[in-house]
Amino acid sequence: MAFDGAWKIDRNENYDKFMEKMGINVVKRKLAAHDNLKLIITQEGNKFTVKESSTFRNIEIVFELGVTFNYSLADGTELTGNWNLEGNKLVGKFQRVDNGKELNTVREIIGDEMVQTYVYEGVEAKRIFKKN
């Protein structure tokens, strides 16, 4: 699948405003903007494994398409939701455990980049990754 491989963060668009809307304090936002995030994504059928390493943490997330699971963001925000394939996009629909508000995420390959788009409370941000 096109998502398979090692990806390294290249740049962000509107990420600070997005994090602010999420309620992340200014110090954590400044650090997160330079988190040196790397993702290693592998897919076997409907099962995905995402190894995430950054300045903040190293974790492995395993999920199956369409199956609800729990996930914690780097700042500790707890989410529940699932990922699905919609055409060539990996679409995540999550809900914050603390306030019930939706956080939607889309991963798609555009050219030689993986673009991860987040939408929360009407604020959209993008994190753009290059193959490592």
UniProtKB/Swiss-Prot annotation:
Hexadecanoate binds at W83, R107. The modification N-acetylalanine is found at A2. GO terms for molecular function: long-chain fatty acid binding. Its main location: cytoplasm. It is found in: Cytoplasm. InterPro entries: Calycin, FABP2, Fatty_acid-bd, ILBP, Lipocln_cytosolic_FA-bd_dom. GO terms for biological process: fatty acid transport; intestinal lipid absorption. It comes from the Eukaryota. One of its GO terms (cellular component) is nucleus. Tetradecanoate binds at W83, R107. Keywords: Acetylation, Cytoplasm, Lipid-binding, Transport. It holds the Pfam family Lipocalin. Forms a beta-barrel structure that accommodates the hydrophobic ligand in its interior. FABPs are thought to play a role in the intracellular transport of long-chain fatty acids and their acyl-CoA esters. FABP2 is probably involved in triglyceride-rich lipoprotein synthesis. Binds saturated long-chain fatty acids with a high affinity, but binds with a lower affinity to unsaturated long-chain fatty acids. FABP2 may also help maintain energy homeostasis by functioning as a lipid sensor. PANTHER family: FATTY ACID BINDING PROTEIN. Belongs to the calycin superfamily. Fatty-acid binding protein (FABP) family. This is Fatty acid-binding protein, intestinal. It comes from Sus scrofa.
